[in-house]
Amino acid sequence: MYKQMSIRVNHFESLRQRFPVFEDLRAHLESEGGVSWIPSDDTKGVLAMSRGKSLNNEMFRSVVWNTETNLPLCVAPFKAKEGLPPLGTQMSATENFVDGFIINAWVGSDEVLHVATRKKIGGTNKFYSEKTFGDLFAECLASTQLKTLDGLKDVLNALRIEQSATSAFVSFVAQHPEHRIVARTTSPGLNVVHVGTVTDTGYMTISERSTNWPQAFARLQIPSYPTRIFHSDQEVHDLLRRTSVEKGWRWQGLVFKDGHGSRWRLRTPTYTMMRELRGAEALPMDRFFRLRANHQVMDYLKHYWEDRDAFWGYEHALRNKAADVFSAYIDVHKAHAVAFKDLPDALKPAVFMLHVHWRDQLRTKGFKVRLQNVNQVMNSMRNFEKQRLMEAAPYTQVSKREVGDLPSPIAEIPETV
């Protein structure tokens, strides 16, 4: 193990020598800014450390630290750079870009398996799925020859003992049908990104090459390509284009590793477009609000048709509320039959913004407020305001004035599903 192409990291060892007590180390890192600390729910004396933008050290992207021994336990893959790799430089690997979620696992001297995402030790957080990342990971693990968390623990503990290390860790990229990002996944799966160990001084060794891993991990290596040195940008783009044609639009791109922890990620144009449509929202309602405001709902549903029923439900609710906002606006600002303060709270932001829009944009042109103006205003509202509006009780118009200005809600709203 670790005979060649390993990353030897003494940065944590040096930090520990400078700051033998964890609280001093913590104060130092916080003085540099950009570090967030995430306590473990079930493991005493363990914190996850996440690097912010102001801390200029890629190794601190996500580190799990034992506060009692003042030692690192596990380090996630360093943050990848976007774009082309250095030219004329021998890469350690040219691999497929595998889209999924990163989850890390380690075994320390307690011989207990622990897992962590970047945000939560134990993997108890969620995103797209109602299941936790820890639960999704267990299902992905079951699809491999490791089978169970106990099987993973045995492999890591054997590695720890073999290397006389205080901890042994592995980073996976997991793919699960319930956590779709771009490509649709039909069954759970795992790939190993790197494997590492930590000594009792904090010295760390990380290997990105499957030839250095325990056999159970080597079976989970990410598919790679023989070309590992590029002499021109065109060579890189040619490989990307050829492979994209061969593998189809669901193929996502390439990752280039230099063997020292740095990675470069080059995505296909199709992947980039679909990733932008998918966005960073965990909840489908928040995603719908963004897409609707940008008139991209139909583009999105061409690829993510599984959200069709939910999106249509949101659209129908918003259309109904557009009619309610229009009616409330007439009652307050046209018929003066209702005081603004007496409107339901959920309607007030939209009615207020609609009046401002009329005052600043429409009045000087002699235009009346129409339902398309309501739609425009609603799209510009904050997401929590839209959600509160959608959940509000129906509004009954008090006055009968200017009812003729209210066309069919369905016909007037341009963003259809």
Predicted regions: what is each one?
Residues Y2-V417:
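Core nucleotide-handling region used for phosphoryl-transfer chemistry
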